[in-house]
Amino acid sequence: MRKPHCTEQALLKRRDVIKGGAVVLASAFFPFSIEILNAGSAVAAPPAPSGTGEERILWNSCNVNCGSRCALRVHVKDGVITRVETDNTGDDRYGMQQLRACPRGRSMRQRIYAEQRIPYPLRRVGNRGEGKFERISWEEAFKEIGQRLRGTIDTYGNEAVYLNYGTGALGSTMGKSWPPAATPVARLMNLVGGYLNHYSDYSTCQITVGMPYLYGGSWVDGNSLSDMENSELAVFFGNNPSETRMSGCKAKTLQHARFTRNTRVIIIDPRYTDSMVSVGDEWIPIRPGTDAALSAALAYVMITEDLIDKPFLAKYTIGYDEESLPKGAPAGSSYKSYIQGQGPDKTPKTPAWASRITGIPPARIEKLAREIAGARPCFICQGWGPQRTTNGENISRAIGMLAVLTGNVGIKGGNTGARENAGYKLPMATFPTLENPVKTELSCFNWYQAIDDYKQMTATTAGIRGRERLIAPIKFIWNYAGNCLTNQHGGINQMHPILLDDKKCETIVVIDTTLTPSARYADFLLPSCLNLEEHDWTSDGDSNIAYVIFDNKCIEPLGEAKSIYDICAGIANELGVKEAFTEGRTQYQWLEKLYAESRKAIPELPPTLEEAYTMGVYKRYFPENHIAYKAFRDDPEANPLPSPSGKIEIYSPRLAELAETWTLLPGQAITALPEYIPNPEGAISAERKEWPLQLIGHHYKQRTHSTYGNCWWLQEVAPQELWINPIDAKARGIEFGDRVKVFNGRGISFVKAKITPRIMPGVVSLPEGAWHTPNAAGEDTNGCANVLTKLLPTALAKGNPHHTNLVQVEKA
C-alpha cells in the first residue's frame, strides 16, 4: 500500500486520543502548509484529561535561547499537561530570587500541543522545498540516513558534513543543540571521522571576533551586572536586558543594581527600549551603525579637555599615542593621531563631525564625554545589537575604548565596554562528545558559500580556519533544533535557490519538534522530544546566582518523537558505532553517571538523581560581584592579558597584517585601530535616496528568536508590528494598525504598523524571528525581516550584518 503524503494541498487532520494515561496520535499528519503555520485557528487546543487520576506537579524548564533558563512547575493529570506555572518557591529575596518564567515559558503547554508538532519520521518526495513528505518508520529513517551519511563521507570526506547552527534547546545536558560541538550529533560524527564545524554565533559574531583584538583571548569579559551597584553612572550602548533577558534572575538583578546606589543610567539606542522604561534616566537616540563615530567624538572631547586616565594608558595599553605604538607601526597610526585628525584621513573626530553621522547634537556629545570621564566609576557596556552591522567588529572595539580611555577596566563599578558578564556557573558534568578529528572551521554565517562555491573559500577570502582553503563542498547538513537554514539567516530570498538544489547539498536532515520554515527544505524530517518529554537537567547563572533545574519527564513523547540521544543512537547502530556511542547506557543511565560526577564538585546536591528531580531546583549565591580583568589591573606583569603584548592593544598589529593580506569586498575594511567605517546601506549612504529608512530588528516578547513563533496566545499579546516614528508614518499616509509594505531590492514583507515616538525618525524596526510566510508571489506576509537583510558576510568575522539595511515603507 502506498504511504500517505503530507502536502501543502492535502492536509490531514490531527487527532489526540488518550489511552492508558498517555497521549497517542492517530495515523494523521499535522498541517504543513506555510499559510497555516502561523494562523491562530490552526493551533489545536490541548487535550483534556480523560480520567480522575491525581494531579502531579513536576519541575522542568524553559531552555530556549533568550539568555535566561527559567523554572517551570508543570501540572500533569492522566498523562496530560493541564497547566504550567513558574517558580513560586522561597521568599524571593535578592540573592536567591525565584527563577520566574516570562509569558513564553508559561505558554509551554501550547508549544507542547501545537498542531505543528512533527508526528513521526518523514521523507521528502518530489522536489526539495515543495512541502511533500511521506511517512516512514524509524528503522527506515535510521537506515537511509546512515547510508546517505556513509556515502557522503566515502565520496567527499568528513569535511562535507556540516552541523548547522541551532539554538532551540540550550543549557540542557543531553538535549542541547548549541554549541554544535556539545551535542549528541557531534558525538556521533566524531565516532565516524568528524565534521565541518563553525565558529562564533548569530548573536555575537562581530563582537566575538573583533573585540578580542583589543583585549586578547577568544571572548572579552565584563563585570557582572550586579556590580553596577558600585557605579556612579552606567552607559548602555544598545544593551536592553529588560527585553533580551526579561525573565529568570536578571530583571531583579538589574533593578537591584540600578537602585542600590541610585546609579544614573544613560541608554544610547535607536529605540526607547524597555530597559529605558524600567531603569533609564536618559535616552540618546542614535542612527544604527554609527556607534564608532560617536565613540570617536567622545574620545576627541576627552583627549582635548585632558579627561583621560593617562597613567592607566601608559601602564596597560599599547598604541594610544605615537610613543606607545608597537614596532613596525607607521607614523601617524596611533589612536590619538586618528582622533585628532593627524592620521592618514586628516579628519578631526569632533562632535560636529560625529553629529552629521549619528544624528546626536554636538552639545550632547560634549556633555556625554564629560559625564563619562567624570563619573567615578562608570559602567560602560554594549549589547549585541550595535555589532550586528556590516562593520560591527570596529564598533565593538570603539565602544570598548571608552572604558580604556577612562581607566574603568578591572575595577569595581567599572567595566570593559563589553556586555555584562553572564554570571557564575555550577560545575555540572556534561555529556562527553569526544574530539572532532576535523579541524577546519568556517563562520557560522557563511556556510551557504560552502554549498554554492566552496573553491573560493580560503583563509584570506572567507575566514576559513584550520587550513588554507576548503577541500570539499557541504553535501550533508544536520539541522537540529534550529531555524537558521532560512528563517534566522540573512537574505532568505537569495538562500532559497541554494537550498532547493539537491545536486549541491545532497542531504538535509532536520531534527526538530515543530514544522518550522526551515523544515520545508528537509530530505528527512525527524521528530525530537521537547524537554518536558524527557529527563535532563538545565543549568545556568546570572550575576551572583548559579543554578540547575532538574527537568522531569512530565509526559510521554507525543506521536513517535524520540530524544536526540536515541535518534543518534539509532543512526550510530546503522553505522556500526552504537556501542561506542552509548557505552551501553540509556539516556537516564548517562544522567545518573553525570550526576554522580557533579556531586563530587557540588556535594550539597541530593544523594540521588531521583531526589534531585523531586527537589527541582538547586541555587547557589555568590556574594562577590565579578570584576573582569581585576588580576590584570592589580598586577599586569604577573597577570598579563592573553594578547600578544600582554596589554590592551589599541593598535592591533594582527589586524594591520590582516588588512594587508585579506581580500575584501567594496565597502569592507579591516583597520588596526577601532575606526569608524561607514556602512554600505548605512546612515550616510547615497542609497538612502531610493531606500530612505534604516531597518533594524529587535528582540520581542512574543518569541525567543523564532521559538514560540507559532503560539497564538503570544501572538495576541504581542502581535508582529513594524515600529515606525510618527514623522515617517505621516509622510507616507500611514496610520496605526495599517498593513504596510516594507521592501527593498532583496525582498518584500507585509506587516501592520506600530506608530510610536519610541523609535527615532529615519529608522524602522521589525521584531526578529517572525516565521517566514511567503505568498504565491514569493512575498512574505508575516513581517519576517530576513527577506530584507543581506547575504553578505562582514569583513573580519564573516558574520551576519542583520542591522545594516535600507528599505522603503508604504501603505499596502
Language-model regions, residue ranges each:
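Extended redox/cofactor-interaction regions of prokaryotic respiratory oxidoreductases
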Residues: 2-5, 178-268, 293, 403-521, ...
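N-terminal export/assembly segments and adjacent metallocofactor-ligating motifs
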Residues: 2-307, 361, 480, 730, ...
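Long, well-ordered, tryptophan-enriched scaffold segments
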Residues: 273-375
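Flexible glycine/proline-rich, aromatic-decorated loop/lid segments
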Residues: 274, 517-550
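Short beta-alpha connecting loops at secondary-structure transitions
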Residues: 280-286, 546-557
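Active-site phosphate/pyrophosphate-binding segments
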Residues: 331-332, 336-452
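Phosphate/diphosphate-binding loops
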Residues: 506, 553-572
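Long, contiguous, secondary-structure-rich segments that constitute the structural scaffold
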Residues: 563-612, 706-708, 712-723, 727-812
